[in-house]
Amino acid sequence: MYTPSVEGIIEAAVKKRDQMNSNLSRYMVAALMAGAYVGLGIVLIFSIGAPLLAAQSPLQTMLMGMSFGLALTLVIFAGSELFTGNNMFFTMSTLAGRTTVKDTLKNWGLVFLGNLLGAILLSLLIVGSGLFKTAAPEHLLFVASAKKMAAPVSELFFRGILCNWLVCLAIWMAARTKEDIAKIALIWWCLYAFIASGYEHSVANMTLLSLSWLLPNHPDTITLAGWFHNMIPVTLGNIIGGALFVGMAYWYTSPVRKRS
C-alpha cells in the first residue's frame, strides 16, 4: 500500500547507519545541529509567547504553535539528525531486516546524546546573550518549565507518545511529497498541532528545561531533578509514538518484508 515510501525510509535509515559507523564524529555533529535547531524554535516561540502571556492574550498558544514549524523545517531542509525522527526510521529498517536491534539502539543513544549536547550549547549561547537575564519568576519560560517538571509521570509519558506521533507523521508526509512548499506546509500543521495541544517533545524540552535551569535568575521550582522527572517519561513516550504509531504501523501496512 505504501511500499515506495516505506522503502525510501528504510534506505534512508541504512544510509544513516552507514554514516554513523564510517565517521562517528561527523555524524555526531549532525546530531548536535538538530538539537540546536529545535532549540532555536523553542527560543523563538517563548520570546513570542511571554509578552502575550503577560497581556493575557487568548492568542498566545495559537501564535506559539504557528511559529514552531521553524524547528523541524531547519532539521529537514538544512540537514541534521533528530532522535525522535530516527525512532521511526530505524524501526522500519529493523523490522524490514535491513538494520539490527543493535544498530537501532546505538543510533538512538548516540543521536539523543548529540541532540542534548546541541541543546545545551545553544542554551549556553542564549544565557550569554542576555536575552532572558531580566526574566521574572512568572516569565513564561519558567512557568512552562516548572509545570513540565512537576507534571505526573503518566501524563508526561502519554503526551510524549502523542507528540512524536505528530512529529514523525510530519517527517513521513514530507518524505512522501516532492514539492518543498508542500513539505513546509505539512511540517507546519503537525508542529502547530503539537505545540497548541500541549504535547511533550524530548528534544524540545532539552533546550527549554536546560535553558531555564542554566539561567542564574531561575526560581526554586526549576531543578535538575525536575529535568530528569520530565525527560525520562517523555523520551520513552516519544519512542513509542514514533516507533509504534508511525514506524511499525506503516511498515505493517506495506508489503516490505526483510529485503536484503
Question: Where are each of the predicted segments found?
Answer:
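Alpha-helical transmembrane segments and their helix-helix packing motifs
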Residues: 1-260
